[in-house]
């Protein structure tokens, strides 16, 4: 009965006060907070040092530490990013740690097509060394910039499954302001596990490709 009378008096006088033994901060500073806000704040404050953790410090260290790139032997090549024949995104730098050969080819180049006939066999022959053979198709048979359909067709025509095909354009070439030097078709760029351009071969020679890859995997 006394509790009910106290409640009625409280409501009539608008003078209800929290008991001194309640768990509360300054209510005036929290009057705009929802119960969820207060609960979240209390939870975060219980995590000692949580605000001192840099989330980027939890990420693995990137092996890509250089600021410049070029098509010069002994330097780091510039990154190439493009979808492959499966429409998966290929990134050259994402393959850090693998020996890589880039085959810059065109659809109107006879020796380029001869190289394409053996690309999958080369890929399989060096699979134990984790070599990656990537054809960068610069132009189609009619000289156009290749689209996704052209990339897929090239892969199907030459039965390329583990050997990748990506699309490029002349914008990649030094002659058009790009980083890759090219003076003949096809041109092969050999990149070691540390993403260093080690050798450049111009023209197609099956024995030369095998020789260059046998040397590359020893680095």
Task: Outline where the language-model segments fall.
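Sec-dependent signal peptide recognition
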Residues: 2-10
């Amino acid at each position: 009965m006394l509790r009910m009378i106290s409640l009625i008096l409280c409501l009539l006088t608008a003078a209800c006060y929290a008991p001194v033994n309640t768990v509360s901060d300054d209510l005036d500073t929290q009057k705009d907070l929802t119960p969820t806000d207060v609960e979240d704040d209390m939870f975060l404050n219980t995590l000692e040092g949580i605000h001192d953790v840099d989330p980027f410090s939890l990420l693995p260290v990137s092996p890509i530490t250089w600021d410049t790139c070029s098509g010069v032997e002994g330097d780091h090549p510039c990154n190439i990013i493009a979808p492959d024949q499966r429409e998966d995104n290929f990134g050259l730098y994402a393959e850090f740690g693998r020996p890589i050969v880039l085959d810059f080819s065109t659809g109107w180049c006879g020796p380029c097509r001869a190289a394409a006939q053996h690309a999958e066999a080369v890929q399989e022959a060096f699979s134990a060394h984790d070599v990656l053979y990537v054809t960068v198709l610069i132009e189609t048979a009619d000289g156009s910039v290749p689209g996704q359909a052209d990339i897929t067709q090239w892969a199907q025509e030459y039965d390329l499954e583990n050997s990748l095909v990506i699309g490029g354009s002349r914008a990649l070439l030094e002659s058009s302001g790009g980083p890759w030097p090219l003076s003949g078709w096809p041109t092969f760029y050999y990149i070691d596990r540390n993403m260093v351009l080690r050798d450049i071969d111009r023209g197609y020679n099956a024995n030369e490709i095998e020789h260059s890859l046998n040397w590359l995997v020893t680095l």
